[in-house]
From Swiss-Prot:
NCBIfam families: PRK15262.1. One of its GO terms (cellular component) is pilus. Belongs to the fimbrial protein family. One of its GO terms (biological process) is cell adhesion. It comes from the Bacteria. Residues 1-28 form the signal peptide. This is Uncharacterized fimbrial-like protein YadK. The keyword Signal applies. It is found in: Fimbrium.
């Protein structure tokens, strides 16, 4: 190899070595968290109005009073979830526990509350989120999430009644921190629904 070629080869190797050192930390410093839950007892769902729920327009005065995330208030927007294609295990008409779990698509709930879905529009309304209530039994309405963010929407249902069943819910806007004011703006929250039975 000619000395000029050797120098050029050394420069290319040095350049590639430096380039690799610069690029590697960016690649090596990224983590990927993969989470899955495999169940053979899942169901498909259909949500009324293709899952688009318009909460309308309200004034800031709508949020006055001591309405908590636990307080069901008539006047929210009703929607239904229809359960279908449950891969039923075994034979016979047996009692199952149907779970309809709601979680924030982004994984982020409103600051300071695990029961309020956050407003995803950073320049939108502040100190406002969304709550969802089960209204299947009018004598027993409840926020679908407990204070620690766990799901409460578990319903006893017989195998023969599960496919094609409909479940009623209501959603409304909720003030997050009672000590702070609400500011006007848009509100949007994406919620994922998981349905399975035990």
């Amino acid at each position: 190899m000619h000395p000029t070629q050797r120098k050029l080869m050394k420069r290319i190797i040095l350049f590639l070595s430096l380039l690799f050192c610069i690029a590697c930390p960016a690649i090596a410093g990224q983590d990927i968290d993969l989470v899955a839950n495999v169940k053979n007892s899942t169901c498909k769902s259909g949500i009324s109005n293709q899952g688009n729920i318009d909460l309308g327009v309200v004034g800031v005065g709508y949020f006055s009073g001591n309405v908590t995330p636990e307080s069901y208030q008539p006047g929210g927007k009703e929607f239904t979830i229809t359960v279908s294609d449950c891969a039923l295990q075994g034979t016979g008409d047996v009692l199952n526990q149907l779970h309809i779990d709601f979680r924030a698509l982004s994984g982020v709930m409103a600051a300071g509350s695990r029961q309020i879905f956050a407003n995803e529009i950073s320049s939108g309304a502040s100190n406002v989120g969304v709550v969802i209530f089960s209204t299947q039994d009018s004598a027993n309405t409840f926020n679908v999430l407990n204070a620690s963010g766990g799901s409460r929407s578990v319903y006893p249902v017989m195998s023969d009644d599960m496919n094609g069943s409909s479940w009623k819910f209501s959603t409304r806007m909720q003030k997050i921190d009672p000590a702070l004011s609400v500011t006007s703006g848009q509100l949007m929250s994406h919620v994922l629904v998981d349905i399975y039975y035990e």
